[in-house]
Amino acid sequence: MELKGKKINFLGDSITEGVGATDPEAMYVNIVKHDAELAEARNYGISGTRIARQSNDEGSAYCDRYKKMDEDADVVVVFGGTNDFGHGDAPLGTMADRTPDTFYGALHTLYSGLTEKYPRSAIAVVTPLHRVGEDNPRGDGSKPEDGALLKTYVEIKREV
């Protein structure tokens, strides 16, 4: 797909927001904007946010935030899941879930909402990057012993 002159909405967490970038031009959203010669690169990244709703959410979950994004995007990029793994308290759920309170259900809610809101737009889903502790079922240490590994979250994103 030719991206030159297109408008892209980037929905994500701290990686999308650009936390840790030493210069705004080093943020991945701005690198894509420059390299692809986009008309607009809209950054909807918020540090620490998750795809699924959490017990103390306050509307920051991706499955809720997409509703507030600009509607004229040619492409929507969804980059997340690492915080659901690392310190999220929503259960994984099952493929049959359609509630935003489980990881499976939140993905269904998000994807169906995006395809309805952006029927003519391309939607790109980016799976979580490798990270420290990805083989720890407790994520960043706050989850139960029987938690899922990061690769499980990646597999679920691909499955849904």
Please place each PLM-identified region on the residue numbering.
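Active-site-proximal loop/turn and secondary-structure-junction residues that shape catalytic pockets
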Residues: 82-84, 129-132
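Conserved, well-ordered alpha-helix/loop/beta-strand core segments that scaffold catalytic motifs
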Residues: 77-79, 122-125
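A short helix->loop->beta-strand "cap" motif at the edges of active sites that frequently abuts
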Residues: 38, 118-122
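Conserved SGNH/GDSL esterase-like catalytic core that processes O-acyl groups on lipids
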Residues: 7-9, 15-105, 151
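Substrate-gating cap/lid alpha-helix
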Residues: 131-160
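Short hydrophobic segments within beta-strands
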Residues: 11-12, 126
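Generic structural signal for well-ordered alpha-helices
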Residues: 107-111, 154
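Short, conserved loop/helix-junction motifs that constitute active-site signature segments
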Residues: 2-3, 70-71, 116-118
